[in-house]
UniProtKB/Swiss-Prot annotation:
Belongs to the phosphatidylserine decarboxylase family. PSD-A subfamily. PANTHER family: ARCHAETIDYLSERINE DECARBOXYLASE PROENZYME-RELATED. This is Putative archaetidylserine decarboxylase proenzyme. It comes from Methanopyrus kandleri (strain AV19 / DSM 6324 / JCM 9639 / NBRC 100938). One of its GO terms (molecular function) is phosphatidylserine decarboxylase activity. Binds 1 pyruvoyl group covalently per subunit. Is synthesized initially as an inactive proenzyme. Formation of the active enzyme involves a self-maturation process in which the active site pyruvoyl group is generated from an internal serine residue via an autocatalytic post-translational modification. Two non-identical subunits are generated from the proenzyme in this reaction, and the pyruvate is formed at the N-terminus of the alpha chain, which is derived from the carboxyl end of the proenzyme. The active site is at 180 (schiff-base intermediate with substrate). Gene3D superfamilies: 2.40.50.100. Keywords: Cell membrane, Decarboxylase, Lipid biosynthesis, Lipid metabolism, Lyase, Membrane, Phospholipid biosynthesis, Phospholipid metabolism, Pyruvate, Zymogen. The record marks 179-180 as: Cleavage (non-hydrolytic). GO terms for biological process: phospholipid biosynthetic process. It catalyses: archaetidylserine + H(+) = archaetidylethanolamine + CO2.
């Protein structure tokens, strides 16, 4: 499976590589290699989320950038305007990770906002509130926020959902090109157990990161 819009990026270098093949093998191979990398980047492998409704899964592939950011810190001021006393888990995506982002829980999109900002490296703490980003607020059990943050290279955020959409856990909700970070926030009062720690490798739609109260 491929992410939506993949053909717009893969087709041009693939076609150019095929056209150049009789005239210049090096340029042809360069174009075909670029097409192969882009096809790899836009891959969208199927994911099977755990059936347990109390398990919130990672919204992104990558490594855990931050274990928990306490409410009241500068990086969480924005999330505190959406949720009461949020706990946040942040995932950093490298260019080699799958970049399709997925819903961590079942819910309905009640707010979808694109916020303009800078293009600082995504691993910086201040990138969460100063970079270009998309904030998705979901009405679920519990309510939760997914924040897609662009980086120094990743400057394009595509959302697959809009306000009013119902999503299931593990369903694709967006994509950041090419790399960056995704934050998941839930109210502290709804958290029963944190299941991951800094440096852990996680997969979107599959790896449980938080157990919520039921």
């Amino acid at each position: 499976m491929m992410a939506p819009g993949w053909w717009k990026f893969v087709t041009p270098p693939a076609a150019l590589g095929a056209a150049l093949f009789p005239w210049s093998r090096p340029l042809s191979f360069l174009c075909l290699g670029t097409a192969a990398f882009l096809a790899f980047f836009f891959r969208n492998p199927p994911r099977e989320p755990p059936s347990d409704p109390s398990l919130a899964v990672s919204p992104a592939d990558g490594r855990l950038l931050g274990y928990v950011m306490e409410a009241g810190e500068a990086s969480d001021d924005e999330l505190s305007s959406y949720l009461d006393d949020p706990i946040t888990v942040s995932v950093f995506m490298s260019p080699l990770d799958v970049h399709v982002n997925r819903a961590p829980l079942d819910g309905r999109v009640v707010e979808a906002e694109i916020l303009k900002g800078r293009f600082r490296p995504a691993f910086r703490k201040d990138s969460a509130t100063e970079n270009n980003r998309a904030v998705l607020l979901f009405d679920g059990d519990p309510p939760f926020v997914v924040r897609l943050v662009s980086g120094a290279v990743a400057r394009r955020i595509d959302l697959y959902v809009q306000e009013g959409d119902e999503v299931n856990k593990g369903e694709p909700i967006g994509m950041i090109r090419f790399g960056s970070r995704v934050d998941l926030a839930v109210p502290r009062s709804s958290v029963e157990e944190l299941l991951v720690r800094k440096g852990d490798s996680v997969k979107a739609g599959e790896t449980p990161v938080i157990r919520v109260k039921r």
